Amino acid sequence: MKTIYCLLAAAAVLAVLVGCQAGNTPAALNSNTNAESANNTNAMKFPYHLTEDEWRKKLTPEQYHVLREAGTEPAFTGQYWNTKEPGVYRCAACGAILFKSDDKFDSGCGWPSFSDIMAQGKVITREDYSYGMHRTEVLCANCGSHLGHVFDDGPAPTGLRYCINSASIQLQDTNTPGWNTDKTAEKK
């Protein structure tokens, strides 16, 4: 009996851990949403870009791994996975406003989940076939940094779940003066 409980517990943990790693590619993203598609961000020019050495100096090791190497932080460990604080979420690499707390919801996957992006053109997407899966990767449209993935199992009205790494975003209180000013700077 103890073995059965251990197996059930292990299966439950595994299901949670892969919650943001698998899913259907959102059909809505392939046709029309607030995201713009890109097939190869390495060849793209972004308004804000640094050399990889500059990124390493600017970001923490965890941020660099997630944002620049398309890494994933462990589930239920990130700073924002369960926060309910109001505000906007900015790209941790360049400061672009990406998401608002009104669109954040508890998906149970262990990463911050949003049903929509702040505005059209804030993120871009590309197909991701890593780890033997087909997913849709989400990147900052301003600097090309990896944010997470988007799936088609989110709440109405969008039906989308933007599963985002905490290390890739920073929460800013909207009661702070100047919260909505563009903190990004073009670096060429």
Regions found by a protein language model. Give the residues of each.
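Post-cleavage N-terminal segment of exported redox proteins
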Residues: 25-27
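Bacterial N-terminal signal peptides that target proteins for export
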Residues: 1-8
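C-terminal motif of bacterial Sec signal peptides marking the signal peptidase cleavage site
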Residues: 16-19
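Hydrophobic helical h-region of N-terminal Sec-dependent signal peptides
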Residues: 9-14
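A short Gly-Trp-Pro
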Residues: 47, 56-90, 96-188
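Bacterial signal peptide processing site
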Residues: 21-23
